[in-house]
């Protein structure tokens, strides 16, 4: 599953790109529900700061 690092700038690009929508705004960065993540990499491909990383 992917997770979002502290590099996240909360731009929302990953949330709109994800085909299964496990991404949501968190307290300071977006968060990914690891159980719902299908590991497609769409979030990582669109992120301008490479915040989504694969576990």
Swiss-Prot record:
Residues 2-27, 28-55 form the 4Fe-4S ferredoxin-type domain. GO terms for cellular component: cytoplasm. One of its GO terms (molecular function) is metal ion binding. InterPro entries: 4Fe4S_Fe-S-bd, 4Fe4S_Fe_S_CS, PSI_iron-sulfur_center. It comes from the Bacteria. The keyword Isomerase does not apply. Binds 2 [4Fe-4S] clusters. [4Fe-4S] cluster 1 binds at residues 8, 11, 14, 47. [4Fe-4S] cluster 2 binds at residues 18, 37, 40, 43. The keyword Ubl conjugation does not apply. Keywords: 4Fe-4S, Electron transport, Iron, Iron-sulfur, Metal-binding, Repeat, Transport. Its cofactor is [4Fe-4S] cluster. Ferredoxins are iron-sulfur proteins that transfer electrons in a wide variety of metabolic reactions. This is Ferredoxin.
């Amino acid at each position: 599953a992917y997770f979002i690092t502290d590099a996240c700038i909360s731009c929302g690009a990953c949330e709109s790109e994800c085909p299964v929508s496990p991404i949501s705004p968190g307290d300071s960065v977006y968060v990914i529900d690891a159980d719902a993540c299908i590991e497609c990499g769409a979030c990582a491909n669109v992120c301008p700061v490479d915040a989504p990383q694969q576990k």
